[in-house]
């Protein structure tokens, strides 16, 4: 894979252009502020009733309606929730874009699954920082940055890649490294990771471990500590130095037990199910299911949210976290 750094990116490809950042959430505030402080001309596009309008103005940013921001802009970054992007694109973005403009995303869902099909007359690019927005912002203010992915879906002007690199540089990402990929690969790996490992697999593993201990007669508090609370200690070791760092840092007892018992949990049958989940991402079945869920009023999602919030691990967890001064919000 191609990796680019500061010397490979030129902010000149965005200087003198009008840049609209649509949305001012976790990623939106980081993109808007970092680019502004990199010397670029940035406005934020929001709904008139958005609670974020006041926050963006307080940060020194000019705020317009989404339609007006797009009409003004040469480059538009869409940082709105996936499920709202198509409707807003159809009603407020597409009618106000001109040939030669650039449409940018931080995740490829709507482009890859053809919910949004831009005309061939505009650039379509992706710049995806591989960290939450608060870390994108914090590292920038510290003079550093986080790694970013870029992808070029369509180059109408001959400058799409240079603009994507310039955007990543404006975020601070070129100091860490900018990896070139495709919309397809970013979207499919991102969704699979969320479903099979990060949000789905890990949560179900935690609940199953907690339930196993409680059903065997152990106190819920001990089950919570062993299966939920201490997971952060292990994940931090993974994050800092990979599997080897974790194995080096834990006791020999933990290392041996993990290496000999872990494969009994993640069996070939589990991996086969992972492959099925990946296939549903690849062939669009998950995307269709999610879009139908959104259009149907989130009935299944709301039911699942209620079930998860009522799990015993949530009750005991809330009680134990109140004992942890470093977690108690002031």
UniProtKB/Swiss-Prot annotation:
Active-site residues are 107
GO cellular component: a single term: cytosol
EC top class, as a word:
oxidoreductase
The record's listing under InterPro entries reads: 6-PGluconate_DH-like_C_sf, KARI, KARI_C, KARI_N, KARI_prok, NAD(P)-bd_dom_sf
Q: Which sites bind substrate?
A: 251
Which positions bind NADP(+)?
Answer: 24-27, 47, 50, 52, 82-85, 133
Cofactor annotation remark? Binds 2 magnesium ions per subunit.
Q: Which Pfam families match?
A: KARI_C, KARI_N
**Official protein name in the record:** Ketol-acid reductoisomerase (NADP(+))
Q: Which organism is it from?
A: Chlorobium phaeovibrioides (strain DSM 265 / 1930)
Q: Which gene encodes it?
A: ilvC
């Amino acid at each position: 894979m191609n990796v680019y750094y500061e010397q490979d990116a030129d902010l000149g490809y965005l200087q003198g252009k009008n840049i609209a950042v649509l949305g001012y959430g976790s990623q939106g505030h980081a993109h808007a502020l970092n680019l502004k402080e990199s010397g670029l001309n940035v406005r934020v596009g929001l709904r008139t009733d958005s609670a974020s309008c006041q926050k963006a103005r307080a940060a020194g940013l000019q705020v317009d309606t989404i339609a007006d921001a797009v009409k003004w802009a040469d480059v538009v970054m869409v940082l709105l929730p996936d499920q709202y992007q198509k409707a807003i694109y159809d009603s407020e973005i597409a009618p106000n874009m001109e040939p030669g403009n650039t449409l940018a995303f931080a995740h490829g869902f709507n482009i890859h699954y053809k919910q949004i099909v831009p005309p061939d007359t505009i650039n379509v690019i992706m710049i995806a920082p591989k960290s939450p927005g608060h870390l994108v912002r914090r590292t920038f203010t510290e003079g550093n940055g986080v790694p970013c992915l870029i992808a070029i879906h369509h180059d109408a002007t001959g400058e799409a890649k240079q603009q994507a690199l310039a955007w990543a540089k404006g975020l601070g990402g070129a100091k860490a490294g900018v990896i070139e990929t495709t919309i397809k690969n970013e979207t499919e790996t991102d969704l699979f990771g969320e479903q099979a490992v990060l949000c789905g697999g890990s949560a179900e593993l935690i609940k199953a471990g907690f339930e196993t201990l409680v059903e065997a007669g152990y106190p819920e508090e001990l089950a919570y500590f062993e299966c939920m609370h201490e997971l952060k200690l292990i994940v931090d070791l993974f994050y800092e130095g990979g599997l080897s760092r974790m194995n080096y840092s834990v006791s020999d007892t933990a290392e041996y037990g993990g290496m000999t018992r872990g494969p009994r949990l993640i069996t070939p049958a589990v991996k086969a199910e992972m492959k099925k989940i990946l296939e549903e991402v690849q062939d669009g079945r998950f995307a269709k299911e999610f879009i139908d869920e959104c259009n149907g009023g989130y009935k299944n999602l709301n039911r699942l949210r209620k079930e998860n919030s009522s799990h015993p691990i949530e009750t005991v967890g809330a009680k134990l976290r109140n004992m942890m001064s470093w977690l108690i919000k002031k």
